[in-house]
Amino acid sequence: DLTNFTSAVIDERAFVKLSGAIDAAKASGDAEIVAGGTYDRSKGWYIRPTLITSTNPGNDIFRTEYFGPILGIFVYDDADFDKVLDLVDTASAYALTGSILATDRAAVELAQQRLRFAAGNFYIN
């Protein structure tokens, strides 16, 4: 059914964790939900795909693996790229996947070198 944007998460425990993260972002002074941010358990454990930005690189949205449709976004100035690589490398003890999206080949090569052990799977585009 192409009218569905997402399916339910796996169980109630996952629903509680994900909806709690959304509620924490809504209550946070340094985070903003820019898309999604809703959930509904009336017919299953549905979490709308959610994008959350934060000005705080220490926000839980960047340190917790949610295994659900939540993506944390940290916007930074290009001049701070080197510092941001350090933040990415130290943000979490765990990282299932990581990715670099850039048009500057030198930035891609630097990030690839600095972050090669930062995640289990690493994508470059």
Label the predicted regions.
Residues A8, K26, P49-T53:
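Hydrophobic transmembrane signal anchors and adjacent membrane-proximal interface regions, especially
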Residues Y39-S42, Y46-N125:
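Conserved C-terminal structural/oligomerization subdomain of aldehyde/semialdehyde dehydrogenase
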